[in-house]
């Protein structure tokens, strides 16, 4: 940051610019223009780093730090990485959230010498800036999830923000207006790798929450970067439009969001931006809102540690292509809220579930397809290889075979919604033939290796490769011709490094060289050497053939790529079709494999699940040859809240999570783990399940819990589903019960939404007497003497205790601790004045397990306090008698 605050003169002085070599001056000029980046400076076969960049990169990458002489009195730190291993090192730098500028050589050393003489410095410049949100390399990004760059624009009224996000690797670009209160939730849905934000918001609560709560990278830009006039011009220029209405009906802040994204891509990609479609405008309310903590609690796309194993995505993902997995990731991140669209997806899933033989064939064929979205992006950005074109060719071929599977099974009787999906699978014969006729099957990854274009496609390519592969034959052919012309049978064509190719004859045959086309080059003691125009031409062709053929192939390849780019819209439709097939065949596969059922959707406020199961827990139990205990859940307008009491380890939290997960799975268009499911569409899901101390943010468990609960109560609507577990447990019992009680009342009376509320506060169960839409449920247990068995069944009724001591014993607490706890529990129960009041009778949060004094100590203290206020000489007989009766009650 210190360098960013220095002006050019100060920078030159710091690095002794005036006494630096020409090459180091070139480096410094480029570095000064990219102070916010690590600069990788191409020198021959290495990318070198200098000064502070070298010290930092050496530590991050674990590579040796060396020196490159001195600049004035200062030693120049240096480290480097081989150019062919660049991606491996970039991975580490990007993972650490560094911005990397790639500076390449724009000419060869030979070209530099021809341009400026022996001391000329090779021309270099930054060809690309790599940031977490602008990666396209397969090795640097997760193949099964999007890699979004987002721009967030907050208008002056602050009521609605605009968000534009783009996945450069697939050319997806979307813009959406987001209510100010939902910004963090929307960002949690997208998980962008990088967010563009105005410098004016650097110290805002929003920026603080994005960075600390969501842990997303923010790249700040000056406020003018988001200026409306500038952004509108950028959009019009990029899409070659005359009127911004060509984008659609968009707000000013949406224009700023789109324009700033395009500008950032232009800056980082150095004008080499891929062919992006017109941004898709979506409605924020089209997708279920799931806030960050709920996504974490439910472990939807990642587990609680940020990995994939044990997440809902890992359980449901049996797609056979990485691009299909990416679409499933998007589905799970963004469940639908429109019944018609949900049912459309469910109908597709049902079709494939009813045609499992077709599913089996399609899944095998899909394995032969490629990620043509990312292939196309690399092609449009001039970073592709022949293998990308071959991938498109093979995918086109496989697509037509897949369509044939449908036609063979159904002919012309396919449902319309399936016909629409497979329409792009007809292929594009023109595109297929173009690639088939031009690109060799063994095309290398690197264009500079040559051998990418089929010889028969272009006569000059064939000729040059013939020279490369058969140069000696051409020389021998010319030799035979000259022998015949001169009659010298001993004539040879030889080569040395001084004069190149030459005709060699013995001195005694010199009189036979009569044709003036033979030009004398050299005479030795016994030999005379000649050349001809033909031989010079052949030599030139042989020497330059490799360079010429690579140059020609690059030109031809660029032309082929331009023709492929013209088919970009079709290729994206094809990719969408194939990705959709993979996901819906996956839904059919898991429905069959795990016995899932098609859910029914209704406009009513219902959530009627029969024999529901938690898909992740069920799969884990199956690996241990155990069975999952299913449970019903029947929420409705008349029974909106289930208050669930019962022991720990009995399955309350699993039950809460499984119902939220069933709603999510249903609304992405999949069958669900249940015997039947009837669901009123859920617009938002909120959960508060457990909380860890957030010491970094200075928040205790209780504060974190209250913040989450506050957000839930503020953002929920009548159509939301709330799951709450142990609200109020992080404070004293009195406070905890009071908070839980009032939260339940608020949900019942104000929000009137569906809610599952698990608690250890059994005092709350009396609320069913005066809250008509609240019903008590508990976990069934089986007692046998001193032992209990958790049956994991949810049944109607209320628990009268939590069996905490049994759970503590199972956890392995010392027997002495358990026995002492039993004594204390008995004392608590003796002080209880009635069912449901044993906890409220004492503020247990302030009691010590090991230093609890007998009840007499408490009585003695009260007596001391009472007697200290009494003057016996002033008591009347009646007052003395009343005092005796009062003291009698204390014993």
UniProtKB/Swiss-Prot annotation:
Lineage of source species: Bacteria, Pseudomonadati, Pseudomonadota, Alphaproteobacteria, Rickettsiales
Gene (UniProt): mutS
Keywords per UniProt: ATP-binding, DNA damage, DNA repair, DNA-binding, Nucleotide-binding
Protein name: DNA mismatch repair protein MutS
A GO term for molecular function: damaged DNA binding
NCBIfam families (alphabetical): mutS1 (TIGR01070), PRK05399.1 (NF003810)
Pfam families membership: MutS_I (PF01624), MutS_II (PF05188), MutS_III (PF05192), MutS_IV (PF05190), MutS_V (PF00488)
GO-annotated biological processes: mismatch repair
UniProt record similarity statement: Belongs to the DNA mismatch repair MutS family.
Function per UniProt: This protein is involved in the repair of mismatches in DNA. It is possible that it carries out the mismatch recognition step. This protein has a weak ATPase activity.
Superkingdom of origin: Bacteria
Keyword set includes DNA-binding: yes
Entries under SUPFAM superfamilies matching the protein: DNA repair protein MutS, domain I, DNA repair protein MutS, domain II, DNA repair protein MutS, domain III, P-loop containing nucleoside triphosphate hydrolases
SMART domains: MUTSac, MUTSd
Chain positions recorded as ATP binding sites: 646-653
Organism (species): Rickettsia massiliae (strain Mtu5)
């Amino acid at each position: 940051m210190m360098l960013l605050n220095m002006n050019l003169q100060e920078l030159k002085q710091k690095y002794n610019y005036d006494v630096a070599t020409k090459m180091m001056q070139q480096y410094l000029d480029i570095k000064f223009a990219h102070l916010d980046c690590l600069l990788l400076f191409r020198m021959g076969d290495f990318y070198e780093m200098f000064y502070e960049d070298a010290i930092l990169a050496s530590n991050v990458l674990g590579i040796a730090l060396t020196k490159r002489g001195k600049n004035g009195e200062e030693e120049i730190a240096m480290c480097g990485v081989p150019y062919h291993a660049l991606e491996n090192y970039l991975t580490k730098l990007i993972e650490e959230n560094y911005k990397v500028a790639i500076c390449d050589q724009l000419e060869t050393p030979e070209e530099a010498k021809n341009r400026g003489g022996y001391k000329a410095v090779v021309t270099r410049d930054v060809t690309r800036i790599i940031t977490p949100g602008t990666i396209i390399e397969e090795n640097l990004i997760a193949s099964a999830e999007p890699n979004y760059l987002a721009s967030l624009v907050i208008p002056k009224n602050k009521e609605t923000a605009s968000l534009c996000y783009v996945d450069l690797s697939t050319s997806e670009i979307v813009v959406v207006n987001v209510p100010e209160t939902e910004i963090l939730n929307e960002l949690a849905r997208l998980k962008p790798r990088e967010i563009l934000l105005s410098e004016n918001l650097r110290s805002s609560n929003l920026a603080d929450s994005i960075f600390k709560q969501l842990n997303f990278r923010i790249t700040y830009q000056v406020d003018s970067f988001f200026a409306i006039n500038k952004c509108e011009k950028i959009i019009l220029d990029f899409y070659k439009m005359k009127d911004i209405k060509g984008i659609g009906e968009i707000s000013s802040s949406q224009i700023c969001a789109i324009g700033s994204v395009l500008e950032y891509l232009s800056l980082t990609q150095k004008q080499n931006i891929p062919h992006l479609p017109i941004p898709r405008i979506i409605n924020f309310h089209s997708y279920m809102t799931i806030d960050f903590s709920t996504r974490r609690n439910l472990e939807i796309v990642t587990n609680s540690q940020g990995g994939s194993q044990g997440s809902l995505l890992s359980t449901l993902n049996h797609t056979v292509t990485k691009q299909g997995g990416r679409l499933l990731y998007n589905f799970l991140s963004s469940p639908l809220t429109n019944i018609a669209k949900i049912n459309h997806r469910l109908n597709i899933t049902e079709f494939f579930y009813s045609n499992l033989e077709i599913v089996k064939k399609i899944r095998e064929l899909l394995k032969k397809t490629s990620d043509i979205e990312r292939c196309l992006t690399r092609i449009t950005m001039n970073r592709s290889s022949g293998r990308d074109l071959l991938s498109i060719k093979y995918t086109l071929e496989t697509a037509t075979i897949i369509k044939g599977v449908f036609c063979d099974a159904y002919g012309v009787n396919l449902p319309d919604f399936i016909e629409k999906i497979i329409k792009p699978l007809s292929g594009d014969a023109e595109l297929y033939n173009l690639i088939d006729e031009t690109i060799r099957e063994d095309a290398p990854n690197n264009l500079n290796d040559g051998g990418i274009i089929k010889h028969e496609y272009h006569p000059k390519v064939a000729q040059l490769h013939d020279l490369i592969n058969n140069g000696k034959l051409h020389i021998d052919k010319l030799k035979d011709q000259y022998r015949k012309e001169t009659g010298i049978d001993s004539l040879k064509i030889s080569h040395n490094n001084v004069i190149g190719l030459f005709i060699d004859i013995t001195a005694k045959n010199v009189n036979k060289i009569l044709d003036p086309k033979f030009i004398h080059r050299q005479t030795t003691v016994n030999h005379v050497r000649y050349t001809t125009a033909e031989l010079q031409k052949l030599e030139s062709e042989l020497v330059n053939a490799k360079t010429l053929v690579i140059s020609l192939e690059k030109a031809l390849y660029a032309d082929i790529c331009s023709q492929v780019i013209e088919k970009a819209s079709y290729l994206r439709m094809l990719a969408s079709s194939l990705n959709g097939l993979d996901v819906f065949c996956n839904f059919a596969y898991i429905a069959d494999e795990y016995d899932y059922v098609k859910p029914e959707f209704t406009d009513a406020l219902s959530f009627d699940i029969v024999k529901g199961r938690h898909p992740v827990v069920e799969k884990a139990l199956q690996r241990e040859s155990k069975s999952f205990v299913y449970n019903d859940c029947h929420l409705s307008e008349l029974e909106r809240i289930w208050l669930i009491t019962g022991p720990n380890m009995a399955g309350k939290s699993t039950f809460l999570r499984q119902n939220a997960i069933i709603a999510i799975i249903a609304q992405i268009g999949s069958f669900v783990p249940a015997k039947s499911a009837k669901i009123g569409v859920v617009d938002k899901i909120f959960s508060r399940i457990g909380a860890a101390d957030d010491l970094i943010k200075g928040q205790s468990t209780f504060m974190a819990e209250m913040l989450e609960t506050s957000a839930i109560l503020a953002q929920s609507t009548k159509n939301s589903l709330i799951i709450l577990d142990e609200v109020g447990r992080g404070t004293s019992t009195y406070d905890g019960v009071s908070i839980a009680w009032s939260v339940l009342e608020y949900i019942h009376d104000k929000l009137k939404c569906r809610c599952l509320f698990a608690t250890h506060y059994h005092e709350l169960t009396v609320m069913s007497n005066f809250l008509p839409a609240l019903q008590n449920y508990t976990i069934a247990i089986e007692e046998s003497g001193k032992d209990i068995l958790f049956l994991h069944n949810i049944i109607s009724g209320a628990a009268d205790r939590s069996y905490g001591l049994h759970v503590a014993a199972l956890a392995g607490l010392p027997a002495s601790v358990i026995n002492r706890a039993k004594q204390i529990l008995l004392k608590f129960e003796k002080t209880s004045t009635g069912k449901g009041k044993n906890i409220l009778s004492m503020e247990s949060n302030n009691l010590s397990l090991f230093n609890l004094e007998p009840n007499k100590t408490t009585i003695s203290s009260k007596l001391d306090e009472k007697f200290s206020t009494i003057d016996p000489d002033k008591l009347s007989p009646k007052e003395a008698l009343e005092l005796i009766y009062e003291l009698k009650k204390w014993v």
